[in-house]
């Protein structure tokens, strides 16, 4: 026997022998449908539209497909209808997923309803055209959204007399709205019907109160706007930071330092005195224009008559100022007949050279020192006013004052007010509009002058009253703020604290520079004592040389110090605590001996106590 091939099984269907028996009949049906396709195209289109449903129907039995009627016409139609069914069934065997139709009203799906046995029997006795029409209607009804909603929720309001319930709800809502409207309208009508004079008065009073509140609010906004506009102007008038905080940036030791503007004024006086001395020794007429050009070349700063007035305020006996004319200037802008400010230095009778006054270099140095002392005395006056304004007030003699109060801001001291310089004599010439107006002022009648004077007095009084009110308000706010901050604290305790603080500040202000340096060294001693003990413990020796001790302590100390400074600190430590650290000079070397049996905490307490005693002196 020959071996069977795989292709021999292609003609067999999955249904087994039933499909093999009907093989001949299938071939005949296919041939007949090919002949009838052209004649029954309309019927096949309708069947294809139905067969395009999501689910492929079950395969019909050979009896249904071969149901031949009495006439050949009906048979050809049935064959043409059944052929697309078979082709679609063959296509249904592919790997494409089936789309399940929604379930019907009685729980079964539309597919089951369409192809149930009872429907199959009914379809056998119907013509193809009516069959397609009925199946289409059935599918459309089953696939419509309304049908699905009814299938899912059979107890919707549409099934249970929805019209009655909706009418009842609407009626109840209308009734509630009418009741609420009556409740709202009743009080308004009653109040409108019973309007009395008291009600009108109350309303009028309320309107007046609202009017006053609105006006007060408008005034408040205006004042705030004015303050906001004035604040930038004040900030722009402030000096730059390098001038306001010049005192804090100085490298020198703290003392009676001058503000930045006072230092600039002192430098201006030195430059001016130098130029005046040169011109005076050459017997030249000293004018302000010559001095101005020379000072500006030396300082690279603007020099005006205002600065000359400040110099006159600080040192009034330095120069003699006059207005003179007929001085040759050799300038196009200044005429010989114009008045000019002349400056002449006041020299003592003993300063003579070759029979005439002479301004020597030593005299210039003395004048410079005298000007500096005058500036310092002006700052001391401001400092004295500041001390009296403290609570409690302090009084420190000027000769014992070595530094300013810590809260006294030196760079915010008021500038020196310029003194009046001699002005050129006025000649009766009406050359400007201002002169014409001043001349026409004499034409005003006495009544008009009196009225203008009264108006000026009234405006001045109003301005004074507003200033007094503002000062009183600021004082009251300051007292209330301090009282609220110190609420619950006894007055005697506050006075004692303030007195102690004032005493401490007074001691700081009158302290000598040597004492200040000693206190600074004593503040570093606790840290040095700790490091020194660790060094001796690590070395495991009772005594160490000076060089070794200083090098070890400098290496461990936070602040960098030279060996000479470290030697001074150790000498001070041995002076304060001789029983703990002792110095022993042996031949050419110096040894430090430390008593390691003493407690370090006791040593630190003794150092702190000694520091407090030194500060209180």
Curated annotation (Swiss-Prot):
GO terms for biological process: DNA replication checkpoint signaling; DNA replication preinitiation complex assembly; mitotic cell cycle; regulation of DNA-templated DNA replication initiation. Ubiquitinated by the DCX(DTL) complex, also named CRL4(CDT2) complex, in response to DNA damage, leading to its degradation. Ubiquitination by the DCX(DTL) complex is necessary to ensure proper cell cycle regulation and is pcna-dependent: interacts with pcna via its PIP-box, while the presence of the containing the 'K+4' motif in the PIP box, recruit the DCX(DTL) complex, leading to its degradation. The interaction with GMNN protects it against ubiquitination. GO terms for molecular function: chromatin DNA binding; DNA binding; DNA polymerase binding. PANTHER family: DNA REPLICATION FACTOR CDT1. Changing residue 7 to A: Abolishes degradation by the proteasome due to the disrupted interaction with pcna. The lineage of its organism: Eukaryota, Metazoa, Chordata, Craniata, Vertebrata. One of its GO terms (cellular component) is nucleus. The PIP-box K+4 motif mediates both the interaction with pcna and the recruitment of the DCX(DTL) complex: while the PIP-box interacts with pcna, the presence of the K+4 submotif, recruits the DCX(DTL) complex, leading to its ubiquitination. It is found in: Nucleus. SMART domains: CDT1. DNA replication licensing factor, required for pre-replication complex assembly. Cooperates with cdc6 to promote the loading of the mini-chromosome maintenance complex onto chromatin to form the pre-replication complex necessary to initiate DNA replication. It comes from the Eukaryota. Interacts with pcna. A motif (PIP-box K+4 motif) lies at residues 1-25. Keywords: Cell cycle, DNA replication, Nucleus, Proto-oncogene, Ubl conjugation. The keyword Ubl conjugation applies. Belongs to the Cdt1 family. The gene is cdt1. This is DNA replication factor Cdt1. Pfam families: CDT1, CDT1_C. InterPro entries: Cdt1, Cdt1_C, Cdt1_C_WH_dom_sf, CDT1_Gemini-bd-like, WH_DNA-bd_sf.
């Amino acid at each position: 026997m020959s071996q069977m091939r795989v292709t021999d099984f292609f003609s067999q269907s999955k249904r087994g022998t039933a499909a093999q028996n009907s093989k001949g009949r299938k071939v005949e049906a296919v041939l007949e449908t090919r002949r009838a396709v052209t004649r029954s195209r309309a019927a096949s289109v309708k069947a294809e539209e139905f067969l395009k449903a999501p689910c492929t129907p079950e395969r019909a039995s050979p009896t249904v497909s071969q149901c031949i009627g009495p006439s050949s016409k009906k048979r050809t139609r049935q064959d043409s209808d059944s052929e697309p069914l078979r082709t679609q069934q063959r296509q249904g065997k592919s790997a494409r997923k089936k789309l399940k139709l929604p379930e019907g009203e009685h729980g079964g799906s539309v597919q089951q309803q369409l192809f149930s046995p009872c429907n199959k029997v009914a379809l056998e006795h119907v013509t193809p055209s009516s069959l397609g029409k009925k199946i289409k209607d059935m599918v459309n009804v089953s696939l419509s959204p309304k049908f699905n909603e009814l299938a899912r929720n059979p107890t919707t309001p549409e099934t249970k007399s929805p019209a009655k319930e909706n009418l009842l709800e609407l009626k109840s809502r209308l009734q509630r709205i009418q009741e609420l409207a009556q409740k709202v309208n009743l009080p308004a009508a009653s109040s409108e019907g019973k309007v009395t004079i008291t009600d009108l008065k109350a309303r009028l009073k309320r309107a007046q109160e609202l009017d006053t509140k609105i006006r007060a609010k408008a005034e408040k906004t205006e004042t705030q706007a004015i303050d906001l506009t004035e604040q930038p102007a004040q900030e722009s008038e402030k000096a730059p930071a390098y001038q306001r905080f010049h005192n804090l940036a100085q490298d020198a030791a703290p003392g009676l330092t001058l503000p930045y503007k006072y230092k600039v004024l002192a430098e201006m006086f030195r430059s001016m005195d130098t130029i005046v001395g040169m011109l005076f020794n050459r017997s030249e007429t000293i004018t302000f224009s010559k001095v101005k050009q020379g000072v500006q070349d030396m300082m690279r700063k603007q020099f005006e008559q205002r600065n000359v007035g400040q110099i006159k305020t600080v040192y009034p006996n330095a120069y003699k100022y006059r207005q003179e004319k007929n001085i040759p200037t050799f300038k196009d802008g200044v005429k010989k007949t114009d008045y000019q400010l002349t400056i002449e230095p006041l020299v003592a009778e003993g300063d003579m050279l070759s029979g005439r006054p002479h301004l020597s270099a030593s005299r210039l140095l003395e004048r410079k020192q005298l000007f500096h002392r005058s500036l310092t005395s002006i700052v001391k006056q401001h400092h004295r006013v500041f001390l009296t304004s403290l609570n409690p007030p302090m009084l420190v003699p000027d000769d014992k004052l070595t530094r300013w109060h810590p809260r006294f801001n030196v760079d915010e001291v008021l500038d020196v007010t310029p003194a009046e310089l001699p002005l050129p004599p006025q000649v009766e010439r009406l050359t400007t509009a201002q002169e014409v107006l001043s001349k026409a002022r004499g034409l005003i009648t006495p009544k008009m002058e009196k009225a203008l004077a009264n108006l000026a007095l009234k405006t001045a009084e109003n301005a004074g009253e507003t200033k007094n009110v503002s000062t009183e308000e600021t004082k009251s706010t300051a007292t209330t703020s301090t009282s609220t901050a110190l609420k619950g604290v006894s007055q005697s305790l506050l006075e004692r604290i303030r007195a102690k603080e004032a005493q401490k500040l007074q001691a700081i202000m009158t302290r000598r520079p040597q004492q200040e340096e000693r206190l600074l060294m004593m503040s570093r001693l606790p840290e040095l004592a700790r490091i020194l003990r660790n060094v001796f413990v690590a070395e495991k020796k009772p005594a160490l040389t000076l060089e070794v001790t200083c090098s070890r302590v400098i290496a461990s100390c936070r602040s960098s110090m030279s060996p000479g400074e470290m030697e001074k600190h150790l000498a001070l430590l041995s002076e304060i605590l001789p029983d703990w650290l002792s110095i022993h000079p042996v031949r050419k070397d110096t040894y430090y001996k430390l008593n390691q049996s003493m407690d370090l905490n006791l040593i630190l307490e003794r150092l702190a106590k000694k520091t407090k005693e030194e500060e209180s002196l």
